[in-house]
């Protein structure tokens, strides 16, 4: 079992590493490529676009051909794209490399969640996804620090060679450690079960909405945090870094505590708690009379996301034993596109950073609480269905 957990964690971590590690080198990258930092900030959106594009096909391929045939090319593409970015001499080539990086990371991301659905029952999967969420929270803190240390001695290209090295490690794990987990193709008598695994299932769609709104909350916070903390609240760059590190610490602590909470409380209780914390955060930020109260509201955001996201993802994947790859892809596409659409629309309409965050917090909490309370599984979700794995 440990091999599946290690491989799943490694496959997922390419996604945040690809986002966060290069940011510290952005000024030098812009200077070398004769582009402005503003022009290269689109590299974030291009990377997410690559991930979304990968998710359009990766899940279906993973369900038909297996998890390894998607993970291995995905890791290989991430390696090639990282090297391509390091060799880019124009901003256009650099952005093309970032898109390819996103494609590779997206393939690996989809496979990771499909593997966890294949190998874990509902309760254990919720615990593992909460732990995975905690580990993922470490990356936005550690990746820029690692990038800074690398750039003390080496040029910005070394950041992408470091990413390529990470990709090589994931590729080796996928080749030699990961075993295929895709369930055997269903017999004719099992076709009704396959047909029941519909993406239009009300319970699944409700969890897609909940997780998409939750991701929109956390990405809105990350995206607006420089404006909120430095421009509006007046913190210095060093203080901003410290606050973000502390918020990551809150996320990690809560994420690592959630598996223990699942041994005491029902998953539904934790999901409700998550959304109540979002609502409390939105109200706190809306009426906050001081920076200290605002910072408390920000910690509520991190705690709320960490308590509920892993549980919601586990519930979303629960009904799918034969189509876990497609379900994982659908979740990923909805989360990436939904959150990006919200941030883009808010910017186009001219909603300020503060109101953007408050708005998504309150909307997410109200909609999600209604879905949690009124949309329940239409049939009992099997704790775990024994599967015959392909060699």
Curated annotation (Swiss-Prot):
PROSITE patterns: MFS
Transmembrane annotation, as ranges: 4-24, 42-62, 69-89, 93-113, 131-151, 158-178, 203-222, 245-265, 269-289, 293-313, 324-346, 363-383
GO biological process, any: response to antibiotic
Keywords, comma-separated and alphabetical: Antibiotic resistance, Cell inner membrane, Cell membrane, Membrane, Transmembrane, Transmembrane helix, Transport
Gene3D superfamilies reported for this sequence: Multidrug resistance protein D
InterPro entries reported for this sequence: MFS, MFS_dom, MFS_Efflux_Transporters, MFS_trans_sf, Multidrug-R_MdtL
Places the protein is found: Cell inner membrane
Pfam families: MFS_1
One MF term in the entry's GO annotations: transmembrane transporter activity
GO cellular component, one term: plasma membrane
Protein topology in the membrane: Multi-pass membrane protein
Domain of life: Bacteria
UniProt keyword RNA-binding, yes or no: no
Similarity comment: Belongs to the major facilitator superfamily. DHA1 family. MdtL (TC 2.A.1.2.22) subfamily.
NCBIfam families referenced in this protein's UniProt entry, alphabetically: PRK10473.1
Function field: Confers resistance to chloramphenicol.
Protein name: Multidrug resistance protein MdtL
Taxonomic lineage from the root: Bacteria, Pseudomonadati, Pseudomonadota, Gammaproteobacteria, Enterobacterales
């Amino acid at each position: 079992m440990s091999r599946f957990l290690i491989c799943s964690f490694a496959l997922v971590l390419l996604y945040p590493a690809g986002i966060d590690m290069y940011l510290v080198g952005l000024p030098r990258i812009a200077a070398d490529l004769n582009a402005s930092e503003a022009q290269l900030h689109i590299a974030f959106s291009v990377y997410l676009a690559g991930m979304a594009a990968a998710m359009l096909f990766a899940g279906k391929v993973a369900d038909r051909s297996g998890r390894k045939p998607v993970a291995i090319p995905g890791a290989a593409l991430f390696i090639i794209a990282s090297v391509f970015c390091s060799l880019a001499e124009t901003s256009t080539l650099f952005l093309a490399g970032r898109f390819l990086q996103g494609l590779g990371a997206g393939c690996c991301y989809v496979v990771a969640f499909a593997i966890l659905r294949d190998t874990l029952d509902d309760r254990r999967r919720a615990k593992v996804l909460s732990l995975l969420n905690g580990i993922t929270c470490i990356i936005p803190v550690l990746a820029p620090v690692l990038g800074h240390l690398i750039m003390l001695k080496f040029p910005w290209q070394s950041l992408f060679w470091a990413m390529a090295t990470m990709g090589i490690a994931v590729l080796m794990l996928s080749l030699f450690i990961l075993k295929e987990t895709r369930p055997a193709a269903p017999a004719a008598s099992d076709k009704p079960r396959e047909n029941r695994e519909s993406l239009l299932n009300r319970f699944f769609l409700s969890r897609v909405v909940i997780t998409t709104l939750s991701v929109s909350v956390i990405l809105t916070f990350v995206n607006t945090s420089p404006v909120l903390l430095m421009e509006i609240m007046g913190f210095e760059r060093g203080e901003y870094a410290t606050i973000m590190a502390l918020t990551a610490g809150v996320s990690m602590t809560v994420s690592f505590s959630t598996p223990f909470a699942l041994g005491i409380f029902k998953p539904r209780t934790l999901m409700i708690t998550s959304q109540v914390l979002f609502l409390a955060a939105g109200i706190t930020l809306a009426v906050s009379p001081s920076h200290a109260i605002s910072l408390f509201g920000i910690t509520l955001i991190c705690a709320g996301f960490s308590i509920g996201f892993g549980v919601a993802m586990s519930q979303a994947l629960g009904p799918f034993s034969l189509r876990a790859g497609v379900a994982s892809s659908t979740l990923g596409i909805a989360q990436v596109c939904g959150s990006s659409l919200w941030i883009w629309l808010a910017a186009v309409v001219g909603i300020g950073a503060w109101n953007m965050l408050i708005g998504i917090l309150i909307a997410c909490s109200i909609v999600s609480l209604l879905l949690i309370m009124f949309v329940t599984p239409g049939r009992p979700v099997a704790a775990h269905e024994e599967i015959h794995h392909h060699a």
